Design a protein with these regions (language model features):
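Active-site rim helix/loop that mediates acceptor-substrate recognition in acyltransferases
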Residues: 13-36, 41-42
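Conserved beta-strand in the GNAT
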Residues: 38, 45-54, 90, 95
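C-terminal "cap" of GNAT-fold acetyltransferases
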Residues: 123-137, 142-144, 149-166
Length: 166
């Protein structure tokens, strides 16, 4: 998948996960714990996560990923296409483990990010959905996300969707 593509042919998914763990611990990374909402069950087990940030901040937030990728994988992602832009609270990642799917957790996390977008005064919440994931696309459409344009990210054909806040 896209994680292996980002790590490159000579590196493992385990190495990629180590990079991501370092980025999560940083304050100024797009994957920072500060940009992450976590859903847990009554036993404190992670039932889902969503990562979002102001699209206008992508370039500054991505610096840490670029540094880590250069150092760990020897790959320079400086020229990587932006996946978001100014004017949207961008949902970078949404994940719900298989055991917790179908319980409304993704909807709850999406609603929380939509609320965050309102509080920030941004005009929209945006995301990219893989064209090969109709289930996710249906979830977003059911919640009010609208098609904006086609995009390619990480070698995958994507659709850029937005939830209008104005």
């Amino acid at each position: 998948g896209c994680c292996q593509n980002l790590a490159g042919a000579h590196h493992t998914l385990a190495e990629f996960h180590q990079v991501m763990e370092r980025l999560v611990r940083m304050e100024d990374s797009q994957y920072s714990y500060r940009n992450t909402l976590l859903a847990t069950n009554s036993e404190g087990i992670t039932a889902g996560i969503i990562v979002s940030y102001d699209g206008a901040q992508l370039k500054a937030l991505r610096k840490r990923f670029i540094e880590e990728a250069k150092e760990t994988f020897g790959i320079d992602y400086t020229g990587m296409d932006p996946e978001t832009q100014e004017g949207e609270l961008y949902i970078d990642s949404l994940a719900v483990p298989a055991a917790f799917r179908g319980k409304g957790i993704a909807k709850m996390l999406l609603k929380a990010v939509i609320e965050k977008g309102w509080e920030m005064g941004l005009p929209a919440v945006g995301l990219l959905v893989d064209k090969g994931n109709p289930k996710a696309e249906r979830l977003y459409a059911d919640m009010g996300f609208e098609y904006v344009n086609d995009a390619v990210w990480g070698g995958h054909s994507m659709k850029h969707l937005q939830y209008p806040l104005r």
